[in-house]
Swiss-Prot record:
This is Transmembrane protein 209. Coiled coil: none annotated. It is a multi-pass membrane protein. It comes from Xenopus tropicalis. The chain crosses the membrane at residues 28-48, 60-80. Glycans are attached at N57, N273, N343. It comes from the Eukaryota. It is found in: Membrane; Nucleus envelope; Golgi apparatus; Cytoplasm. The keyword Cell inner membrane does not apply.
Amino acid sequence: MKEEEQRTAMSFIDTTIKMRKEANAKKVVLAWGLLNVSLAGMIYTEMTGKMISTYYNITYWPLWYIELALASLFSLNALFDFWRYFKYTMTSPNITLSPSQQKLLGVPYSSAQSSPPRDLITNKVPASTPSPSMQGQNVLSYSPSRSPSSSPKFSPSCISGYSPQIQAMLPSSGSPFTSVVSYSSNSFPKITSYSSSPGSSQYPSNLGPVEGGLRSRYRSSPSTYSSPTDKEDYMTDLKLLDTFLRSEEEKQHRVQLGSPDSSSTAASPTFWNYSRSVGDYAHTLRKFQYQLACRSQAPSAHKDEADLGSKHAAEEVWGKVTMNRQLLDHMDAWTAKFRNWVNETILVPLVHEVDSVNTQMRRLGCPELQIGESSISSLKQAALVKAPLIPTLHIIVQYLDITPNQEYLYERLKELSHGGCMSSFRWNSGGDFKGRKWDTDLPTDSAIVMHIFCTYLDSRLPPHPKYPDGKTFTSQHFVQTPDKPDTSNENVFCIHQSNVNPPYYELVYQKHITBRNNLFHTLLMFLYIIKTKESGMLGRVNLGLSGVNILWIFGDH
């Protein structure tokens, strides 16, 4: 029985493929037929008018026989093409397809009869009562308020491998039109019914990764299935199935939010409530009424970065840089992108390179020279001595030259590089060190990030004769207390760290100094001015896509 149904399905597919080929062939033979008729007509016109022989003054009778042969050839070709076109038109396979099946199989609408899917499966799915083994299985429940014409139908070819409950009750057929799942909405407590052939086998299948058994909210008490009745709702692919389930999920979510008693029967996932008025939801609307939170007027220096970098605290600061206050709406997104850029571009490669250098040191017989254990002076000396063997050590030492406590710095760099977006970052403190809390003798996370950011740009900017140490960016664009920037110079454009603990940063631009702000907002203002005022150029280096590639964090703003 199963092999016979499979052969039927294969013959159906072969027929549709043949129809597609014949539809394409009809267009070709019709075009050739019209072309041959046109050529034969032109030659016949010349034969009667004798235009060529008169114009070229040649003997007419030899030319007439040649033209007669060509006219006969083109006429025969035209007759043959029209005969093939008539054959394809009149002897085309008579097959009935629904509009959705015609679209899925690529069969032209003119090549097949349009009919509801029930015409295809009426004779293949006889109605019968469910077997006892089907009792107790969860099946799809459906809304009683929906009309039968809007209920979905699923073919086994679309839901094979999905829900074990459904798969176990489907007939073992390879035909995509053998049986389907449908719903009933005759009364409120009723759910669905199922029809299967008497000899159909039951078999389990693995749960599909997409729908997860067609979602548990559509499962209900033991019930039965019936065959489909409407062609409009015949589902033919997984995308339509997923769209339907998502829409029903949203409807159920709205119903549950409007339910006065979540424990009542009407509020359970099995049932759907669409008949309530707006007044029935008044108590819920009052309960979930939206209320504005109060803003903090003066961020405390002891609070975390989230408070200090709030939108309210940054309004006046950004107002001095740009008049567009709508930019503040993008501040959180810019900050997240910038943190991710620092992590992926600087922190993670730096930690990996440090581990690589430590491994090379051990291979060279210098296990005592390990980054995170040796002093910064020993590392600088080793960078000079081992430069031919480990050329990257000199670059790494510049990133580490911020604190004498190299062990804490190395461990903190590894902690900050974890999580993808520096999730352990603390703007006014750092991490624990050897079981004790962070103290002021250790650098803050803000100081570490600022240092590695400046060092990275030092490596990207070309060397300058005024700064033989190679710190071009740091010397020109970063001033740390107790030093102060020259505000009388209009060309000064730098970041000023006005306080160490807690760390405060100010942006100096065109003789103006912004109010204190957190690290990331100050760096964002610095980069935003470069993008909007300096055309993305920091000196001779492009910070855009063709250079450092950091200005992408602002998008099109």
